[in-house]
Amino acid sequence: MERNDRKVLMTLLSVNIDHVATIREARRTNEPDPVAAAAICEMAGAHGITVHLRGDRRHIQHRDVKILRETIKTKLNIEMAATDEMIGIALDVIPDQVTLVPELPGEITTTGGLDCTRNQQAITNAIKRLQSNNIGVSLFVDPSEQQIRASLGLGARTIEINTARYSDATLTNHPTKEGAEALEDVRQAAEFAHSKNMQVLAGHGLTYRNVGAIAKIPHIVELNIGHNIISRAALVGLERAVLDMLAVLQ
């Protein structure tokens, strides 16, 4: 999808529902069910649902992705490491898209983008196996021309630009030099990837307050946002939280 007329076409929103499962797993119970949360997000207008199936199963479970595949009406994007176990699960579930991400034991959240200049064989094999089963593949990368070139060389046609540095620099409403520089890095990365005929997504740490500038960047067609939406949902409800984010993106 190419957005030549920004007044007509808005940036798409994929809602990451991991932290609905985080609440459930805090008590090792059945509620809240991320499957129900996904349905609410879709009914509120979300264009897709994202989940991260981690090796340690700290929140999303195999059961969740199997049921989500049967119930989601929009687009199911599963974030995962490029391991044999995870790729096997993806080939069983057949999501619309897999986003390959780095994964470190004990990390609170994903700490950076894939290093596409290393572990190339594992990433390439994962991409080939997924694409041969008609599963779209995106690589989560830092806003670096080197990483984008490397991802293209590995066979990727879609990237998700890591917005963590921008997000960390824009936690308040006060403009900062670091925030402006990080925003420009994302803009340049999106422009470069687009020039290579790649589809460009973005996400990580985005909030209602800082997402507007990212959504205005040409060629970024979709944003993956989770924690801030789920945090707001705890106060105003999930439907309202999704509607509020969609309003910002418009």
Range-by-range predicted roles:
Residues 5-85, 89-95, 153, 178-181, ...:
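Conserved N-terminal beta1-alpha1 strand-loop-helix module at the mouth
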Residues 58-84, 118-138, 178-202, 245-249:
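Alpha-helix-loop-beta-strand connector modules within alpha/beta enzyme cores
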Residues 100-107, 158-171, 219-238:
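Glycine-rich phosphate-binding active-site loops on the catalytic face of alpha/beta enzymes
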Residues 84-93, 144-154, 202, 206-220:
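Catalytic cores of alpha/beta
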Residues 136-192:
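Histidine/lysine/aspartate-rich catalytic loop segments that bind and position anionic ligands
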Residues 11-17, 49-51, 76-78, 98-100, ...:
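Hydrophobic faces of well-ordered beta-strands that scaffold small-molecule active sites
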Residues 69, 172-179, 231-250:
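C-terminal helical cap(s) of enzyme catalytic domains, especially alpha/beta-barrels
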Residues 45-47, 71-73, 92-98, 132, ...:
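Glycine-enriched alpha-helix->loop->beta-strand junction motifs that scaffold or abut catalytic
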